[in-house]
Amino acid sequence: FLTESTSGTSFTNNGSSKIHTVELTTLTPNTRYYYRVVVGNYESYSELYDFITPPESSSEADFKIIAMSDMQRDNSNPNKFNEIIHDGVIDYISEEHSNDLAGELAMVLVTGDLVVTGTSYYQWQDHFFEPSEDLFSHVPLYPVFGNHEQNTDYYIKYFHLPDNGTPGYE
């Protein structure tokens, strides 16, 4: 599966974790890619994950996305995001489509308010990334900045989004 490698950058975040950034270029549309994150000379490495690139827009091929909003933790129902991811999305794909998350979903769009307080490191880790890891390791995430993210460094560090939009609206 893994015949090529690339490298990127990494830095320590909040003293207790590392953020790794890699830009993948020249990917072929509608193709499954496998990846793992390797630190150093295989000092540590992740499980093997996969994702599928979207089809060419000119093909007009159908694809599925999930759109959700306001996924920040609610004290009256603190596990709702985890339930949506695991009991909703992942269980449904597993039952209906042989657990092929990458094959069934082209992307997940979260239209803001990923956490309650964007300046809180533990909320990003414990309330957003940890519950969603099983989904986002196979399906690309496209987050949209909400008022709860509060224009924080964490959002900017975690998400490197394309800036090639319509001129004047990048």
Regions found by a protein language model. Give the residues of each.
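Divalent metal-dependent phosphoesterase catalytic cores across multiple superfamilies
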Residues: 1-145, 149-169
